[in-house]
Amino acid sequence: MAKQIQAIRGMNDCLPEQSPVWQKVEQILRQVVASYGYSEVRMPIVEQTHLFKRAIGEVTDVVEKEMYTFEDRNGDSLSLRPEGTASCVRAGIEHGLLYNQERRMWYMGPMFRHERPQKGRYRQFHQFGVELFGINGPDIDAELIMLTHRLWRLFGISDHVTLQLNTLGQSSERAAYRDALVAYLEQYKDQLDEESQRRMYSNPLRVLDSKDERVQAILVKAPRLFDHLGEESLAHFEGLKRLLESAGIKYEVNERLVRGLDYYNLTVFEWVTTSLGAQGTVCAGGRYDGLVEQLGGQATPAVGFAMGMERLVLMLETLELNADIRPAVDVYLAMVGEGSEQAGFQLAERLRDALPDLRLMSHCGGGNFKKQLKRADKSGAAIALILGETEVQNGEITIKYLRGQAEQQTVTVDAAIALLAAKGD
């Protein structure tokens, strides 16, 4: 026997038993973003490597350690996309979507990072992202957060997530703060872990989110970014907080929240949970007003967020909030006796014409009545439609309820259609 070929580590199959949860999540995401006026954009999975180096920053974990990068047959360096914002901005610039206009876009699809696979973190993962271009104020930042808050309510997880907020100010303010932070950290250089020592000069703000307890103890007396912010940056942040408070959305200000990508400025936020253990971030985003110009477009204010869909699905499963997911099959059609197979397939097509949303599985492969009912029960269907010789002769169908105590009944095909339609409402 030939050796089995298995999926790449950290890149998982979504099996038929799992897909209904994903479909439900995707349906809710699509409905909500549409209600806020966003349109879908679909970008390629592979991009030129320098797109991500310019957008995310060359001295970041994503670019330095995690990207899947390869050289194609033309000698060009290409990468599987590690996130969606850079690709979305590139598409907007390339097709003239961002020139002097407001644009609201969303996307959903696989991303790739070479990380150590663990619960909630995979090498191929699916990301849902929302990006808005052309609006400056804190009002749109607040609306994006309200959008995510609506999602949590619809998913039933509002009580299990917490909003963390921070502001990174403008680049000139961060530069002054960066100098002050480096000067402070240099006093404790020998006490920092190896990763923080490396980041201290290349990307010192990332030291703030170090998980090392010794580093966190050193940071207690470190300079504060808030002390280096100008009036406009502080006013933007205060405006955002007021809008969230008026909307009844609770938040925590986390001055250590800096995000792992270089393009953010002003508002940054994360929705975190304790339901997933170490992988606590469900959704994250912020403002990136300089990125469009950085990638060759006209200066354009922008803000967005992204969420890892695997983590969201895992959270729903962990909290057992996926019980109402519709099964893959609603109705199973069993056919027994002479003439039933031909009549059965005609009936199945008639039912599909009349009830497009009905999930109907017709029995194939032969077998007696008992075997077919066993297959019907195993399919997860709530109802079995039974078509035997008598039903064929009389133009009727027998309805057997596989879940619950309702009695079996034999009715006309029109009556069966009406009954199934009523149950679908």
From Swiss-Prot:
- One function term, GO molecular function aspect: histidine-tRNA ligase activity
Q: Which GO terms describe its cellular component?
A: cytoplasm
User: Under which EC number(s) is this enzyme classified?
Assistant: 6.1.1.21
List the SUPFAM superfamilies.
Class II aaRS ABD-related, Class II aaRS and biotin synthetases
Q: Which residues form a coiled coil?
A: none
Xref: CDD domains: HisRS-like_core (cd00773), HisRS_anticodon (cd00859)
Its recorded reaction(s) are: tRNA(His) + L-histidine + ATP = L-histidyl-tRNA(His) + AMP + diphosphate + H(+)
Q: Read off the Pfam families from this record.
A: HGTP_anticodon, tRNA-synt_His
Its BP terms in the Gene Ontology are:
histidyl-tRNA aminoacylation
InterPro entries (UniProt xref): aa-tRNA-synth_II, aa-tRNA-synth_II/BPL/LPL, Anticodon-bd, Anticodon-bd_dom_sf, His-tRNA-ligase, HisRS-like_core, HisRS/HisZ, HisRS_anticodon
Q: Which UniProt keywords apply?
A: Aminoacyl-tRNA synthetase, ATP-binding, Cytoplasm, Ligase, Nucleotide-binding, Protein biosynthesis
- Localisation per UniProt entry: Cytoplasm
Under the subunit heading, UniProt states: Homodimer.
What is the similarity comment for this entry?
Belongs to the class-II aminoacyl-tRNA synthetase family.
NCBIfam families on file:
hisS
Per its record, how is this protein called by name? Histidine--tRNA ligase
